[in-house]
């Protein structure tokens, strides 16, 4: 393989690596947890990060318990889990 082709291949591989998103990079592990409504009955609208849709979605939170993948606002969810 000529040095010109090798440089072109190296350049294309570098470009591909820069443009390919790395799933979960810098995302807290708790963003992977499913939504948990908790044990109480307050029925508050909260947001969680969904691994299936790769987006923040609404769920009904009972007001106590649950896990760390719960946010009062969609902006807080985006800042924490989407980036």
Swiss-Prot record:
Signal peptide coordinates: 1-25
Disulphide bonds in the chain: 31-81, 40-64, 56-77
Keywords annotated in UniProt: Disulfide bond, Protease inhibitor, Secreted, Serine protease inhibitor, Signal
Main location class: secreted
PROSITE patterns referenced in this protein's UniProt entry, alphabetically: BPTI_KUNITZ_1 (PS00280), BPTI_KUNITZ_2 (PS50279)
Classification via CDD domains: Kunitz_textilinin-like
Pfam families with a match to the protein in the record: Kunitz_BPTI
Domain (BPTI/Kunitz inhibitor): residue spans on this chain: 31-81
Site (Reactive bond for chymotrypsin) location in chain: 41-42
Compartment list: Secreted
MF terms in GO: serine-type endopeptidase inhibitor activity
Expression by tissue: Expressed by the venom gland.
GO cellular component labels: extracellular space
Keyword Disulfide bond appears in the UniProt entry: yes
UniProt function note: Serine protease inhibitor that inhibits chymotrypsin (Ki=3520 nM).
Record-stated family: Belongs to the venom Kunitz-type family.
Full protein name: Kunitz-type serine protease inhibitor
Organism taxonomic ancestry: Eukaryota, Metazoa, Chordata, Craniata, Vertebrata
